[in-house]
Structures are given as structure tokens and as C-alpha cells.
């Protein structure tokens, strides 16, 4: 069976502990990627990646590796776009999936909001992380793992 790997854009990710538990339950490997040092549990399925300095070093590291049997967890919309184009499943920490159908509009709205904030016409950012977001994320991650496993099994037999 093809191995599924989870790539976690770890800087400011509020669901890392949940990712570790789901990965252990499903026997899925996890790459926790950050620009610098980040603490991760000592577990054979979990690896820490310090992608190095640079504003997009962690994003580039993930985008260069993510593929069809991988799941990327990120709130970074440009990174999500790159990974969706590479065929990876992408889930935001609030459980929202980024798909081929949704990523174009999501990226356009993100760019518009960035421009509005830069011009001073709008302030603020996304709403705060809620307990229901954690639940939605866990459900979305379980579904993505099961979907990829079914697709791999169908291709093999």
C-alpha cells in the first residue's frame, strides 16, 4: 500500500496535538515543518523539519514534496494553492478543505483582503479558533486519510 504522509505547516498551527493522535491511530507518518526549531513528540512516525531561514522556507519545503497520497495541514492560502496543484489533499486547521474547485476563489479573496488591509480600508483578520473548528478538523483529517486509502486500494486491486 502507498504510504500516506501528513505535512504540517507548523508555525502557529493550533491542531498539532490532534494531528499526532490521528497519525498514531492510523499509522501515518508526519513531517512537522517550521522555519526553525519546533518541539515534537518523540515518536517514530513523527519527524521534525527545520526548513531554515527565509520567509517561505517551510512553505517551499512542503510544496516541493507534497503529492497525491499526501495531506497538507496549513492555513497559508498560497501554500495550499501550490499543494492542491500538486495533487495533495489540503486541510486548514479549522477543517476547511482546499480543493481544485475552491482554491482559485479562496486565493482571490485572500489577495483582495490583503490589498484592502494594506490600503487601510479594512483592519482585522480571521475569526479566532473555536472548539467546533477542532472537531471539524478531526473529522476532515479522518475523511481525507480514509479517502486516500480507498483510492490507493482501488488502484492496486
UniProtKB/Swiss-Prot annotation:
Q: Which domain of life is it from?
A: Bacteria
InterPro entries assigned to the protein according to its UniProt record, in alphabetical order: UPF0178
Identify the CDD domains for this entry: PIN_YqxD-like
Task: Describe the family membership recorded for this protein in Swiss-Prot or TrEMBL.
Answer: Belongs to the UPF0178 family.
Identification of the protein by name: UPF0178 protein Nwi_2152
Which species is this record about? Nitrobacter winogradskyi (strain ATCC 25391 / DSM 10237 / CIP 104748 / NCIMB 11846 / Nb-255)
Amino acid at each position: 500500500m502507498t504510504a500516506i504522509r501528513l505535512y504540517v505547516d507548523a508555525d502557529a498551527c493550533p491542531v498539532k496535538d490532534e494531528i499526532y493522535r490521528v497519525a498514531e491511530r492510523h499509522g501515518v507518518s508526519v513531517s512537522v515543518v517550521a522555519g526553525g526549531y519546533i518541539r515534537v513528540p518523540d515518536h517514530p512516525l513523527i519527524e521534525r523539519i527545520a526548513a531554515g531561514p527565509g520567509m517561505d522556507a517551510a512553505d517551499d519545503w512542503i510544496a516541493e514534496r507534497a503529492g497525491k497520497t499526501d495531506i497538507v495541514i496549513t492555513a497559508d492560502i498560497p501554500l495550499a494553492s501550490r499543494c492542491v496543484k500538486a495533487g495533495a489533499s489540503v486541510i486548514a486547521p479549522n477543517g476547511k478543505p482546499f480543493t481544485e474547485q475552491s482554491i482559485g476563489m479562496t486565493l482571490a479573496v485572500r489577495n483582495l483582503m490583503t490589498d484592502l488591509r494594506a490600503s487601510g480600508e479594512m483592519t482585522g483578520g480571521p475569526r479566532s479558533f473555536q472548539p467546533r473548528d477542532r472537531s471539524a478538523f478531526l473529522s476532515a483529517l479522518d475523511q481525507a486519510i480514509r479517502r486516500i486509502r480507498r483510492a490507493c486500494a482501488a488502484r492496486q486491486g
